[in-house]
UniProtKB/Swiss-Prot annotation:
Its main location: cytoplasm. GO terms for biological process: protein refolding. It is found in: Cytoplasm. Gene3D superfamilies: helix hairpin bin, Hsp33 domain, HSP33 redox switch-like. Under oxidizing conditions two disulfide bonds are formed involving the reactive cysteines. Under reducing conditions zinc is bound to the reactive cysteines and the protein is inactive. Redox regulated molecular chaperone. Protects both thermally unfolding and oxidatively damaged proteins from irreversible aggregation. Plays an important role in the bacterial defense system toward oxidative stress. It comes from the Bacteria. InterPro entries: Heat_shock_Hsp33, Heat_shock_Hsp33_C, Heat_shock_Hsp33_N, Hsp33_helix_hairpin_bin_dom_sf. The lineage of its organism: Bacteria, Pseudomonadati, Pseudomonadota, Gammaproteobacteria, Pasteurellales. Disulfide bonds join C233-C235, C267-C270. One of its GO terms (molecular function) is unfolded protein binding. Belongs to the HSP33 family. It comes from Actinobacillus pleuropneumoniae serotype 7 (strain AP76). The gene is hslO. This is 33 kDa chaperonin. CDD domains: Hsp33 (cd00498).
Length: 296
């Protein structure tokens, strides 16, 4: 098998006679570009892959315009892991470690005592934040518990990370009983059992329609057009310049003196470097002063 047209794609589908909806996503370049600028331990790479898949699936199932942040905070060797996504399936991820992490470390060994925080920020409407105890062995199980508690909807996730043809890849399936109350638990359990039979090479290597046929060839499945996923940082020179202006000018001048007249800032997410001399900083300050005068 070889890479297919469905790399970096998310598909939604509906089981017509079961009142269950589903999603499938595979992250190829979306995942590898997240890892390119960091030397994360293998276990952290896998965790970020799982979180990217989960965020992609969550963003698609909630059907709103805005952003979702899935964040892990703990007191273990992995201090922080965070993924941001939006309705355009633009994703980014970041992790911070504070001690060595073995390649085969479990979630609890990495996190220690920690929580999973899901922040939903619609462009229009109220923000929502859910906090979930990381008291289960995997992210998948914690998220399934989240859906039961917050949405009262049976939800099943399959999330895998690994390598395919020498490249990092992450993929997943989501099944959810329809929120209109017409779904039957036994139908959901049947489809969930079938989903668990998926092999890594199928999830990572098949096109969506072939994968769904292999899993659900006796079902009537309506597949909707795909949505592309991509790594998207969103950093910019303007944002970095404005971040410098959060400091007092006296402190900025001291930094310029210490750094031979040039302040450099590197994006923690994508690794892009931005350089600012005194003239550039003053240009940003003048623009900020104008906006303040206009009340913007």
């Amino acid at each position: 098998m070889s890479y297919t047209k469905d790399n970096d794609k998310l598909y939604r589908y509906l089981f017509q006679n079961r009142a269950v909806r589903g999603e499938w996503v595979r992250l190829n370049d979306t995942f590898t570009e997240t890892l390119n600028t960091h030397q994360y331990p293998k276990a952290v790479q896998n965790l970020l892959g799982e979180m990217l898949v989960a965020t992609s699936l969550l963003t698609a199932i909630m059907k709103f315009e805005g952003t979702i942040t899935v964040q892990i905070q703990g007191d273990g060797p992995l201090k922080l892991a965070v993924v941001n996504g939006n309705e355009k399936q633009q994703l980014r991820a970041l992790a911070r470690t504070q001690a060595e992490i073995a390649d085969n470390a479990s979630l609890s060994e990495m996190i220690g005592n920690g929580v999973l925080v899901i922040s939903i920020m619609p462009n229009d409407g109220e923000r929502y934040q859910g906090v979930i105890a990381l008291d289960k062995p995997t992210i998948r199980e914690c998220l399934e518990d989240y859906f039961i508690r917050s949405e009262q909807l049976q939800t099943h996730l399959v999330i895998r990370t690994g390598e395919y043809e020498g490249k990092a890849v992450a993929g997943g399936l989501l099944l959810q009983i329809m929120p209109d109350g017409t779904g039957m638990p036994e139908d959901f359990e049947h489809l969930m059992t079938l989903a668990e039979t998926v092999k890594d090479e199928e999830l990572f290597g098949l096109e969506a329609e072939e994968l769904l046929f292999r899993l659900y060839h006796e079902e009537q499945v309506e597949v909707y057009p795909p949505q592309e996923t991509e790594f998207y940082c969103g950093c910019s020179r303007e944002r970095s310049g404005n971040a410098i202006l959060l400091l007092p000018m006296e402190e900025i001048d001291e930094m310029l003196a210490e750094k031979n007249g040039v302040i450099d800032m590197q994006c923690e997410c994508c690794g892009t470097q931005y350089f600012f001399d005194k003239n550039a900083i003053m240009e940003f300050k003048q623009e900020a002063d104008k906006l303040n005068q206009l009340g913007l």
